[in-house]
Amino acid sequence: MAKIKVEEQYFDYAPPVRVHGSLRLLLRYVPEEHLNGLHTITLTNSESLRSVRGKITSEKQRFRPADCQGLYGKGRIFLNIDLIFSQDPELFLLFPPFKTFLIGEVLYHEIGHHIHRLEEPGYRSDKEVVADEWKDKLLELFLKQRYWYLARPVRLLSPLLRLIVARLRARIGEDDT
């Protein structure tokens, strides 16, 4: 496996759950050739990125780095852990497949940018669509290989799970206002 350094760089923040193990697990399921040239993944929080000047343009919109769940640039990935976990109740994070899925969505999207830059440069102008396509491929590969036994129960319970998640998210939204 490619030697990728994982750094934790938080400012006045401690993640509600351990993230490092889930990150390493997700990386094990990415084909080796897609990780070549990727040397550092930094786990951080939005407060730590507030000092980064400038904005990032994505899909004709401009964002501050502190407002992004993940960032990719020339072999480095930054995962903004507090934003990744902010939309879901902490209770859900205690369920390892759910926590790993949340991290995987952002990590695999950023790896999609890396793959696009190295293997398909100039392939398409819409980099976000390409990164999302790679995210879907890598996440499907991971879920089929790692959590194959959850496929049938999740399929049967998905309408109920969607309802529960929607209500919890609505309740969180009400608490914020």
Regions found by a protein language model. Give the residues of each.
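A metal-dependent hydrolase signature that marks the N-terminal structural subdomain at the beginning
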Residues: 1-78, 89-95, 175-177
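Long, well-structured alpha-helical subdomains associated
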Residues: 2-7, 17-20, 142-177
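Short pre-active-site segment immediately N-terminal to the catalytic Zn-binding motif
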Residues: 84-106, 121-122
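Active-site recognition of the HExxH zinc-binding catalytic motif
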Residues: 105-118, 131
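Short conserved catalytic/interaction loops centered on acidic-Pro-aromatic/His motifs
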Residues: 117-130, 146-150
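An active-site-proximal "capping" alpha-helix that borders the catalytic cofactor pocket
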Residues: 126-141
